[in-house]
């Protein structure tokens, strides 16, 4: 489709702290750079692929961290956009776990990070209170602010999986 495209996996980019971040996939085409971050989260299931092979999927669980990590990818792509030569990037999630795209409306400490169908995320994102009314603290997963606003619009991949793509 794009034979002139250069594709690199796990490409390092400098970050604002003087270190490096690694981007899952980077496509370079006609002088433009398109960074892509991927998340693949599964719920335990046995599925049959297009060739008839049976595949056992593991349960990743920790939906709260999966949502956080997806939005943190968007944050990282926003920051990268400010320091690198690219006009747009993409955050992509593929999952068979409806906990990501269904809004249960059950109050939880990760309400600010939920990525259910129709949710809009932007600005300051932080953890809320636990069911005991205490501030949730997660080492290594702190608050952050998104510059843009992103609508979560899930799409059907097949009868098992759905995917989410946000352009940054």
Question: Each predicted region: which residue ranges?
Answer:
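Nucleic-acid nuclease catalytic cores
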Residues: 78-109
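A structural signal for short coil/turn segments at secondary-structure junctions
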Residues: 2, 29, 81-85
């Amino acid at each position: 489709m794009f034979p002139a495209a250069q594709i690199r996996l796990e490409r390092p980019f400098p970050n604002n702290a003087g270190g490096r971040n690694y981007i899952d996939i980077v496509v370079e085409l006609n002088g433009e750079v398109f960074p892509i971050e991927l998340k693949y989260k599964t719920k335990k299931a046995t599925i049959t692929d297009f060739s008839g092979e049976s595949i056992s999927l593991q349960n990743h669980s920790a939906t709260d961290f999966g949502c956080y990590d997806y939005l943190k990818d968007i944050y990282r792509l926003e920051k990268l956009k400010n320091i690198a030569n690219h006009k747009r990037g993409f955050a992509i999630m593929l999952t068979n776990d409806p906990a990501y795209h269904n809004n249960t409306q059950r109050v939880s400490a990760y309400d600010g990070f939920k990525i259910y169908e129709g949710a809009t995320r932007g600005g300051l994102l932080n953890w809320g209170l636990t069911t005991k009314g205490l501030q949730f603290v997660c080492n290594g997963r702190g608050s952050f602010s998104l510059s843009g606003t992103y609508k979560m619009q899930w799409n059907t991949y097949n009868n098992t999986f759905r995917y989410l793509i946000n352009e940054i």
